[in-house]
Amino acid sequence: MIDTKVNIAGVEFKNPVIAASGTFGFGREFLEYFPISKLGGLATKGLTLREREGNKGVRIHETIGGIMNSIGLQNPGIDAFIEEELPFLNSQDTVIIANVSGNTIDEYVISVEKLNQTDIDMIELNISCPNVKEGGISFGTKAEIASNVVTQVRKVCQKPLIVKLSPSAENIVEMAESCVEAGADALSLVNTFPALAIDISKKKAIFDNITAGLSGPCIKPIALRMVYEVSKAVDVPIIGIGGIMDYRDAIEYIMAGAWAVQVGTANFINPNACAEIIEGIEEYLQKEGISTLEEIRGII
């Protein structure tokens, strides 16, 4: 009898597969493909204190081995999310994780205070956002800046707190250790990689913001290495992200030390990706005679 359950910061997931933020909307869009209750968890579209219309111009661009995106955190804002989207999510039998972004520490804090009053299961702090009070540098680049935002959020956060790390961190292990010391209950890594694409006919960058976030299979070996390194350095659960397209990728992340995985780009290519990965993990465990994920977690 196999058991795919995992417990992260006191929250039980029926399996280790989580739909990644920004790739699954608020879940409704995928109901025609499979029951959302099949998921271990669902991370919401990135939420900000106020509504955001997102970026102008090109938002998605395919590249070899991946996808580049510049959505600009388009979302209805925390209040509208709580009123219009959360009731549906709460009706689904899966772990709901609110992904929160901000341009100032106060924005993060106020958003989390609002979510404290809801039935959200966990909060995932996206620290890849530009810090307007530090000249636009990402909260997730320097450990000291990240530690500050996590510390302030931890003071008010009444939910289990996941911090989502950026691959742009000066030192990913130091960043992870700083966030855990500041109060993170778990870490998810990594976010998209800053990347550039140029239209040589127009002689200009494809995206209006010049750079965009790169995701997909091309980033997996680097993201996998980061998960491995961080898992050896901290004692909180790790959620692996980056280029997970099938169950084999998910198993690799677990063997590298991840407790769970988030599936992102694969959802754009195959709306059934999460469901198929869940089934693939179960079949793999059965075939290999493995009873629990703990038996293979971090074996590398």
UniProtKB/Swiss-Prot annotation:
* Primary localisation category: cytoplasm
MF terms per GO, please?
dihydroorotate dehydrogenase (NAD+) activity
Q: In which pathway does it act?
A: Pyrimidine metabolism; UMP biosynthesis via de novo pathway; orotate from (S)-dihydroorotate (NAD(+) route): step 1/1
Q: Which UniProt keywords apply?
A: Cytoplasm, Flavoprotein, FMN, NAD, Oxidoreductase, Pyrimidine biosynthesis
* Gene Ontology biological-process entries: 'de novo' pyrimidine nucleobase biosynthetic process; 'de novo' UMP biosynthetic process
One Gene Ontology cellular component term attached to this UniProt record is: cytoplasm
Q: How is the cofactor bound?
A: Binds 1 FMN per subunit.
Can you tell which superkingdom this protein's organism belongs to?
Bacteria
Top-level class of the enzyme under EC nomenclature: oxidoreductase
What family does this belong to? Belongs to the dihydroorotate dehydrogenase family. Type 1 subfamily.
Know the name of this protein? Dihydroorotate dehydrogenase B (NAD(+)), catalytic subunit
Q: Which organism is it from?
A: Petrotoga mobilis (strain DSM 10674 / SJ95)
UniProt gene name:
pyrD
